[in-house]
C-alpha cells in the first residue's frame, strides 16, 4: 500500500509538472520584480518607483540583450548572390525611395549596413541658412514642438518629464536679459527612414553626456504606458551654443537601436551591458572635449543603426516662430522655423562624412 501511495504521489507530481514549473517561474519573476522596486526606491527615484511594475514588465519584453542579439543578426554578412533580392524586397516592403540611395544596394554587406545607408546629398537641400532659423536634423516625423516654459516638458500625450533629468544636467540660458526663450522639437525616425542625423543650424559643442538606460520602443503608445520614457531610455546629449544661445542636442536609443555613433567620438560605446543604468543609480558618462567641435547647418553629426528619436532644445530670440505642423513628415534640411523670410543658397545641400 505504501508503495502504491508513493506511486500515486509521483503520478500526481508528474501530472502537475507544468503547473509546478509555472508557479516556480512566476515566483522567481515576482522576486526579481520586488528587488527591482527596491533598487528604484533605494536610489530615491520616487517617479520610477511608482511605476516600477510597468518598467519591470517592459524590461522583460524589451530587454537590452534582445537588442544586442538583433544587432548581431543585422551585422551578419549576406552573400553577394542574395543581396539584390533581400534589399529589393526591403525597399518594396518598406516603401523606400531607391533613387535616393547614394551607393549601389549590392555594396551593402548586411541588413544593418543597408539600414544605415547614405542618401544622395543633392536630394536634401538646406531650406534656410539665415541666422536664428532651424532646419530638420533628420528624415522623420515631427511629433512635437513648441516653447519650453519650465523644467518639465509635456509631450504629445500630455505626459510630462523632467528636462534636467533627461539632459543629465541643469539647462540654462546664455542670455539672461529677457530677450530669448527656450524652444524644443522632438523627431521620430521610423526604421525605413535615413538613419543619420545632422546639424539643425550652425553650432558648436564641447560637452557630450552618455546616459545609459533602457531600449524601450518610442512609439506613441509607450509614452502613455511609461510616463517619463525619454528619461528611462539610453541617450547621448551634446551641449553647446549657437547664434541664439545655448543648445542641447539629444539622440535617444530605442528597441533594436542600441547603437548610437557620433562622428569623431570613438570613446562613445552605447548599449554596454556592463554599464549600470543611470536611472538605477549608475553614473552619467561626461566627456569634455579639449576644444569646441563646430558643425554647420546640414553637417552630419552621427547615426543610429535603426530608427529612433532626436530631441533638440535650443535658446532663441523671442520673435522666433515655427512654420510646420505637429505630426508632419519632414526631411533633413527642411526649414522648420525662423525669424523673417528664409534665406537659401544655391547648391547648398546636407553634408555627409567623407
From Swiss-Prot:
Its cofactor is pyruvate. The chain crosses the membrane at residues 18-36. It is found in: Membrane; Endoplasmic reticulum membrane. One of its GO terms (cellular component) is mitochondrion. Its main location: membrane. Pathway: Phospholipid metabolism; phosphatidylethanolamine biosynthesis; phosphatidylethanolamine from CDP-diacylglycerol: step 2/2. The modification Pyruvic acid (Ser) is found at residue 308. The record marks 307-308 as: Cleavage (non-hydrolytic). It catalyses: a 1,2-diacyl-sn-glycero-3-phospho-L-serine + H(+) = a 1,2-diacyl-sn-glycero-3-phosphoethanolamine + CO2. One of its GO terms (molecular function) is phosphatidylserine decarboxylase activity. Binds 1 pyruvoyl group covalently per subunit. Belongs to the phosphatidylserine decarboxylase family. PSD-B subfamily. Eukaryotic type I sub-subfamily. It comes from Plasmodium knowlesi (strain H). Catalyzes the formation of phosphatidylethanolamine (PtdEtn) from phosphatidylserine (PtdSer). Plays a central role in phospholipid metabolism and in the interorganelle trafficking of phosphatidylserine. This is Phosphatidylserine decarboxylase proenzyme. The active site is at 139 (charge relay system), 198 (charge relay system), 308 (charge relay system), 308 (schiff-base intermediate with substrate).
Amino acid at each position: 500500500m505504501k508503495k502504491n501511495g508513493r506511486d500515486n504521489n509521483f503520478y500526481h507530481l508528474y501530472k502537475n509538472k507544468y503547473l509546478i514549473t509555472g508557479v516556480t517561474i512566476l515566483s522567481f519573476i515576482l522576486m526579481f520584480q520586488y528587488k527591482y522596486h527596491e533598487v528604484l526606491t533605494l536610489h530615491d527615484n520616487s517617479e520610477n518607483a511608482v511605476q516600477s511594475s510597468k518598467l519591470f514588465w517592459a524590461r522583460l519584453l524589451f530587454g537590452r540583450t534582445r537588442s544586442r542579439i538583433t544587432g548581431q543578426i543585422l551585422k551578419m554578412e549576406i552573400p553577394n548572390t542574395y543581396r539584390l533580392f533581400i534589399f529589393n524586397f526591403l525597399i518594396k516592403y518598406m516603401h523606400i525611395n531607391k533613387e535616393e540611395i547614394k551607393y549601389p544596394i549590392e555594396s551593402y554587406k548586411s541588413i544593418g549596413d543597408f539600414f544605415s545607408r547614405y542618401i544622395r546629398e543633392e536630394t536634401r537641400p538646406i531650406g534656410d541658412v539665415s541666422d536664428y532659423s532651424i532646419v530638420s536634423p533628420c528624415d522623420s516625423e515631427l511629433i512635437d514642438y513648441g516653447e519650453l516654459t519650465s523644467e518639465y516638458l509635456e509631450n504629445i500625450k500630455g505626459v510630462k518629464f523632467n528636462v534636467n533629468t533627461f539632459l543629465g544636467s541643469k539647462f540654462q540660458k546664455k542670455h539672461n536679459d529677457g530677450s530669448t526663450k527656450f524652444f524644443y522639437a522632438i523627431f521620430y525616425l521610423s526604421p525605413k527612414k535615413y538613419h543619420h542625423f545632422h546639424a539643425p543650424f550652425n553650432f558648436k559643442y564641447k560637452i557630450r553626456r552618455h546616459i545609459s538606460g533602457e531600449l524601450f520602443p518610442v512609439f506613441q503608445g509607450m509614452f502613455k504606458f511609461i510616463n517619463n520614457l525619454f528619461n528611462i531610455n539610453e541617450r547621448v546629449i551634446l551641449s553647446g551654443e549657437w547664434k541664439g544661445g545655448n543648445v542641447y542636442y539629444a539622440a535617444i536609443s530605442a528597441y533594436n537601436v542600441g547603437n548610437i555613433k557620433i562622428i569623431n567620438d570613438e570613446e562613445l560605446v552605447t548599449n554596454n551591458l556592463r554599464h549600470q543604468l543611470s536611472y538605477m543609480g549608475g553614473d552619467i558618462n561626461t566627456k569634455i572635449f579639449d576644444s569646441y567641435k563646430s558643425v554647420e547647418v546640414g553637417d552630419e553629426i552621427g547615426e543610429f543603426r535603426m530608427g529612433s528619436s532626436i530631441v533638440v532644445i535650443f535658446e532663441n530670440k523671442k520673435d522666433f516662430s515655427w512654420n510646420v505642423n505637429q505630426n508632419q513628415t519632414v526631411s533633413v534640411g527642411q526649414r522648420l522655423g525662423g525669424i523673417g523670410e528664409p534665406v537659401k543658397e544655391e547648391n547648398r545641400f546636407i553634408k555627409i562624412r567623407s
